[in-house]
């Protein structure tokens, strides 16, 4: 993935109008930003361009306004948080194209920053409409994409626009692509993948792609129950997609053919109620009581997974190993995450993780900062794991 241009290749930015596509889709409550993580992550790139004398023009989407203005999806309420995190004033453009945008941009001086209104206020954004992309391009000299989280969508501000102007990856995009290259495209082997979460149905493509690329694949969470069921084990009242038993068997057969070792739970923490601190016991997976649910992996499974991580040089993680939001069913996820973090800190493992639940689980384990890279891009990270091309990245690569 290194065949794309970065800010290092952009030349002098003094006086240049830089269209910077960012992801500002932050959670809001009562008109206030409740989690500024995505804003904080783009601040260094904004500062770098502004400090070099570039005129920073921020493009972003927010919510799903269906191609026309909707006050509840305005980017304006984000302005104060953005300005505060940036430590400098940020102007606002009432539209992202047309006269309102052009006049606001014309007033910028070198080093100024402006946020333009929601790109999704125009139907042309999600349709990847060439005319809308041209209208966006008219306001810039160069284009920088800093929104990996939107890279799996072929929209005008992520794909068509990148083909109309000299296009570069921002620092966040660059870090994400470098991490993903180390994770699967050119990894240090052996590679281990941990895939958890509730359902096999949402991760069939991902599992089929991974068995061909990794040396060891740990399957945990609710989805492991479907595989255990496919092997003829009784999983009691556990979450289980019994209709996908044949799919599970197919994935197991493909893994065998590709010499990928599948690691399934050998024991489980079971309970009869789905609630925190429910009465529980650890049992072998072939002795799950008929009235109980599997809610986490057991101690022997944790030891097996930790042992596999000891052998690996690269780890790719998506999805928790159990119902981590309920104590004590977070034990497996926390123990394995902390073990991977220790190996990473000791320089023995490159660890890449992503997906909403995964980020929350790692933060819960207190190791969100200790992995080599944690991707905040849910859908784009999953599509990359599935081996799909990401339009926003391909558009940058085309110019690389």
From Swiss-Prot:
Pathway the protein takes part in: Carbohydrate degradation; glycolysis; pyruvate from D-glyceraldehyde 3-phosphate: step 2/5
Positions with a binding annotation for substrate: 23-25, 38, 61-64, 120, 153
Keyword annotations from UniProtKB, A to Z: ATP-binding, Cytoplasm, Glycolysis, Kinase, Nucleotide-binding, Transferase
Reaction(s) catalysed (UniProt annotation): (2R)-3-phosphoglycerate + ATP = (2R)-3-phospho-glyceroyl phosphate + ADP
Annotated GO CC locations: cytosol
Binding site for ATP: 203, 325, 355-358
E.C. number: 2.7.2.3
Domain of life the protein comes from: Bacteria
Enzyme class: transferase
GO biological process, one term: gluconeogenesis
Record GO terms (molecular function): ADP binding; ATP binding; phosphoglycerate kinase activity
SUPFAM superfamilies in alphabetical order: Phosphoglycerate kinase
Pfam families: PGK
Subcellular location: Cytoplasm
Family to which this protein belongs: Belongs to the phosphoglycerate kinase family.
Subunit structure: Monomer.
Protein name (record): Phosphoglycerate kinase
């Amino acid at each position: 993935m290194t065949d794309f241009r970065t800010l290092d290749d952009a030349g002098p930015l003094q006086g240049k109008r830089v269209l910077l596509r960012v992801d500002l889709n932050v959670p809001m409550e009562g008109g206030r930003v409740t989690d500024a993580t995505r804003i904080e992550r783009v601040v260094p790139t904004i500062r770098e361009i502004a400090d070099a004398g570039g005129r920073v023009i921020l493009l972003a989407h927010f919510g799903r306004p269906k191609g026309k203005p909707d006050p509840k999806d305005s980017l304006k309420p984000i302005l104060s948080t953005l300005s505060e995190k940036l430590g400098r004033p940020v102007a606002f453009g009432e539209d992202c194209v047309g006269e309102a945008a052009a006049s606001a941009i014309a007033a910028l001086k070198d080093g100024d920053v402006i946020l333009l209104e929601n790109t999704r206020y125009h139907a042309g954004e999600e349709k990847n409409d060439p005319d809308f992309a041209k209208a966006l391009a008219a306001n810039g000299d160069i284009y920088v994409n800093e929104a990996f989280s939107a890279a799996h969508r072929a929209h005008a501000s992520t794909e068509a626009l990148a083909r109309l102007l000299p296009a570069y990856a921002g620092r966040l995009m660059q870090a994400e692509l470098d991490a993903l290259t180390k994770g699967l495209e050119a990894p240090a082997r052996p590679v281990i993948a941990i895939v958890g979460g509730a359902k096999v149905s949402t991760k069939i493509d991902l599992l089929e792609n991974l068995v061909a690329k990794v040396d060891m694949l740990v399957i945990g969470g609710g989805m492991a129950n479907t595989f255990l069921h496919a092997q003829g084990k009784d999983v009691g009242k556990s979450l289980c997609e019994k209709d996908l038993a044949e799919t599970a068997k197919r994935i197991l057969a493909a893994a065998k053919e590709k010499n990928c070792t599948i690691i399934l739970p050998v024991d489980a923490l079971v309970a009869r109620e789905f609630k925190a601190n429910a009465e529980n016991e650890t049992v072998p997976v072939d002795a799950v009581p008929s009235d109980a649910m599997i809610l986490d992996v057991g101690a022997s499974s944790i030891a097996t997974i930790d042992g596999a991580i000891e052998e690996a040089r690269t780890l790719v993680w998506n999805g928790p190993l159990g119902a981590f939001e309920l104590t004590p069913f977070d034990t497996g996820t926390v123990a394995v995450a902390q073990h991977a973090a220790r190996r990473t800190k000791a320089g023995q493992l490159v660890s890449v993780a992503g997906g909403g639940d995964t980020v929350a689980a790692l933060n819960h384990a207190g190791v969100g900062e200790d992995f080599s890279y944690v991707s905040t891009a849910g859908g784009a990270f999953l599509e990359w794991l599935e081996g799909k091309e990401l339009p926003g990245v391909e558009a940058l690569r085309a110019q690389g």
